[in-house]
Amino acid sequence: MANVVQAKDNSQVFGVARIFASFNDTFVHVTDLSGRETIARVTGGMKVKADRDESSPYAAMLAAQDVAAKCKEVGITAVHIKIRATGGTRSKTPGPGGQAALRALARSGLRIGRIEDVTPVPSDSTRKKGGRRGRRL
């Protein structure tokens, strides 16, 4: 696990919060600045019992609060946020838990550095799932 980080009086100790918000689940994953060491990783599915609630804003909020508590324990006082949707040939908008997770991190007392959208956007995509005539209902 991560060691406790010592900071100077007025300086911030930064981590990177990677929020992956799909329509099925929300991941809140905090690493050090290089991304090599995981400090905390909690998902919406770890916080609620019903499968349908995994991607809900409430589950994302609980996950983010857990992650924030772990960050403070380790000594991280500020985070850069990278928010991501499924992307590629699928949805390029983050799921319902993305905004809630971001707000929960901000309200928990962690300072927010940069907020960046890192959804993978294809320059020229592979063929989309569903076939020539698309998904028929």
Swiss-Prot record:
Indicate, by first and last residue, each region the UniProt record lists as having compositional bias (Basic residues).
Answer: 128-137
Q: What is the lineage of its organism?
A: Eukaryota, Fungi, Dikarya, Ascomycota, Saccharomycotina
Which keywords, in A-to-Z order, does the entry hold? Ribonucleoprotein, Ribosomal protein
Q: Which InterPro entries match?
A: Ribosomal_uS11, Ribosomal_uS11_CS, Ribosomal_uS11_sf
Q: Does the keyword Ribonucleoprotein apply?
A: yes
Q: Which Pfam families match?
A: Ribosomal_S11
Annotated NCBIfam families = PRK09607.1
* A GO term, aspect molecular function: structural constituent of ribosome
GO biological process: any one? Answer: translation
One GO cellular-component annotation of the UniProt record comes to: ribosome
Q: Which family does it belong to?
A: Belongs to the universal ribosomal protein uS11 family.
Question: This protein's superkingdom?
Answer: Eukaryota
Stretches for region Disordered: 116-137
Could you tell me what this protein is called?
Small ribosomal subunit protein uS11
